[in-house]
Amino acid sequence: MNKLITLLLAVLMIISCVYSDDVEITDDEVVQATPTSDVSFSYIFPDNQDKNFAAGSVVEVLVGFTNNADKALNITHIFASLNHPQDFSVFIQNYTRGDFGIAVEKGHHATLAYRFVPSEYLEPREFGLLISLEYQDGAQNFTQTFFNSTINITEKETSFDMDSFFLILLGLGFVGGIGYIVYGKMPKQKKVRTVSKVNKNAVRVETEDETAEWLSGTSAASSKVKSVQKVVKKNK
């Protein structure tokens, strides 16, 4: 009889231990639970709606958070990671966690902006992207992954292209035209001319050769004129 009682006690102890373990596991699951019925999410990549992200460039995602619960919820963090496209458990890059601390009352909506930068050294190819949001209801913390999909990393666009070149040329031409118009309308300075005074006494000297040339073909040409000097003085 004693053996039977001892056996029953042992069975009860084993059952009690198993039940206790089940309760602990359930509690852990509740802490990590994500009650999707209490919240709803929306998102958009305003500059990358085709989900093509340039390596080394800022990527912005706008997250819509609607509180469907019967009490206020506090948004604490948003974080993201780049993963292997075939195995999302393989992390390639973890991005900076964004701190928010925004309280959303029941029945209200909030929009948050989260930004991250894929490394400029990433090869242009397909990657997996996870973006998650953490929030709390005052007693428990919850995590919701609202984006879980593949994206494409592309080469970073050059900062200078032909469109930029023509825009620069157009701008320079416009500035040059404005400058030319302004310069043409500016008053020009008058040039000051220096007028030299003419001496009232004019002196003309004629040599023998000049006189001979002037008298060539006349009767006076035969006369030998050694030198003629005429001084003409104008009356004052």
Swiss-Prot record:
Belongs to the TRAP-alpha family. Keywords: Calcium, Endoplasmic reticulum, Glycoprotein, Membrane, Phosphoprotein, Signal, Transmembrane, Transmembrane helix. The chain crosses the membrane at residues 164-184. Disulfide bonds: none annotated. It holds the Pfam family TRAP_alpha. Shows a remarkable charge distribution with the N-terminus being highly negatively charged, and the cytoplasmic C-terminus positively charged. Residues 1-20 form the signal peptide. The keyword NAD does not apply. TRAP proteins are part of a complex whose function is to bind calcium to the ER membrane and thereby regulate the retention of ER resident proteins. Glycans are attached at residues 74, 94, 141, 148, 152. It is a single-pass type I membrane protein. Residues 21-163 are lumenal. Heterotrimer of TRAP-alpha, TRAP-beta and TRAP-gamma. It comes from Dictyostelium discoideum. This is Translocon-associated protein subunit alpha.
